[in-house]
Amino acid sequence: MALKRKDFLGLYNVEADEINEILDTAQAMKEIFTRTVKKVPTLRGKTIINLFFEPSTRTKSSFDIAAKRLSADVMSISKSSSSVAKGETLLDTARTLEVMGADVVVVRHSAPGAARFLAENLSASVLNAGDGAHAHPTQALLDMYTIKEKMGKIEGLNVLIIGDIAHSRVARSNIWGLTKLGARVRVVGPGTLIPRDIEEMGVEVYRDLDEALEGVDVVNILRIQLERQQKGLFPSIREYRHFYGMNEVRLRKLEDRALVMHPGPMNRGIEIESIVADGEQSVITEQVTNGVAIRMALLYLLAGREINDEDLA
C-alpha cells in the first residue's frame, strides 16, 4: 500500500496507523537482509537523489544502501559537489535534478523547513533526512522500530530522552512518534537545553537524571553538541558528564530488560560511557541496521507500490 502523501516530511502530521504501516513494511524489508543476495527488483527504473547539505555518515550511507537494495538508480550529491557551491539556489539544484528524471529527492539541510520548501515546489516526492533542529523522521522511525522489535510493543512503555532537547530534531521527532503510539515520554537535561513549552507536546520534564531513570523501559541518549558549550548553554563538559552522562552506576539503576539507545555519532566519555554503549542493554548497532530497513520501507511506499511476493522476490 502506498503512503497517503506525496512527501514524507515529519511525524507531526502522521497518524498512528500510518506509522504502524511503515514499521510493518520495514519488517518485510528486513527479511531481505537474511538472503544471500540482499537485493530485490522493486524500484528498478526509479531514480533516487540523495541531496545532503550537511555532513552525514549513517543517514546518507543508509539511504544509499536502501535505494540500491531496492534496485533503484541512486545518485548522492553533497553541498561541495553541487552547483550550490557556485551560488545556485537549493530550489534550482533540485529542479535541475527533477527534470533529469528524479522520482524521490531525499534532502538533508541545515535550514528548518528546507524539505517542506522543496516539497511545495517539486512534483517529485521529497523525503526529509533532517532539516535543522526541526525534524528527523527516519531516525525516530528506526528508533521506534528497534523498540518494538526488542520489547514487542511501544504502547505503555516509559521512554526517557536525555540531553539537548531544545536543539534536537531527533528528540522532537521521537516525541511526536512515540506519543502517537501510546508511549509515555520523559525528557531530562540542563534547564537551558529544555524548551519552556515542551510539556505541551505531552512529555514529562525532569531536571535530575537519577530521578528520571526510575521505572524507564528505554533510555535514548542524545549527542551533546559541543558548540553549545561554547555559547554558554551549559557550564562545562565535565559538569555535563557529571550530571547528565550515562555511566555504569546509572546503568545499574535500570531493569535488565531496559534498552539503551543513541542516534549517533557518540561522544564517548561525555554523554555516554563506553561500558554503557557497548554493554548488553545497548541496541545502538541494531539502530543502524534498522535504519536501512526503515529507509527501504519509506522509499518503497513513497513510490506507490503495493507489497506482494513478486515485488519482494
Swiss-Prot record:
InterPro entries: Asp/Orn_carbamoyltranf_P-bd, Asp/Orn_carbamoylTrfase, Asp/Orn_carbamoylTrfase_sf, Asp_carbamoyltransf, Asp_carbamoyltransf_Asp/Orn-bd
Protein keywords: Pyrimidine biosynthesis, Transferase
Binding site for L-aspartate: 86, 169, 223
Residues that bind carbamoyl phosphate: 58-59, 108, 136, 139, 264-265
GO molecular function: amino acid binding; aspartate carbamoyltransferase activity
Reaction equations catalysed: carbamoyl phosphate + L-aspartate = N-carbamoyl-L-aspartate + phosphate + H(+)
Pathway: Pyrimidine metabolism; UMP biosynthesis via de novo pathway; (S)-dihydroorotate from bicarbonate: step 2/3
SUPFAM superfamilies registered for this protein in UniProt: Aspartate/ornithine carbamoyltransferase
EC class name: transferase
Example GO biological process: 'de novo' pyrimidine nucleobase biosynthetic process
Domain of life: Bacteria
EC number: 2.1.3.2
GO cellular component annotations of the record: cytosol
Family to which the UniProt record says this protein belongs: Belongs to the aspartate/ornithine carbamoyltransferase superfamily. ATCase family.
SUBUNIT field: Heterododecamer (2C3:3R2) of six catalytic PyrB chains organized as two trimers (C3), and six regulatory PyrI chains organized as three dimers (R2).
Functional summary from the UniProt entry: Catalyzes the condensation of carbamoyl phosphate and aspartate to form carbamoyl aspartate and inorganic phosphate, the committed step in the de novo pyrimidine nucleotide biosynthesis pathway.
HAMAP family per record: Asp_carb_tr
Cross-referenced PANTHER family: ASPARTATE CARBAMOYLTRANSFERASE (PTHR45753:SF6), ORNITHINE CARBAMOYLTRANSFERASE, MITOCHONDRIAL (PTHR45753)
Stated name of the protein: Aspartate carbamoyltransferase catalytic subunit
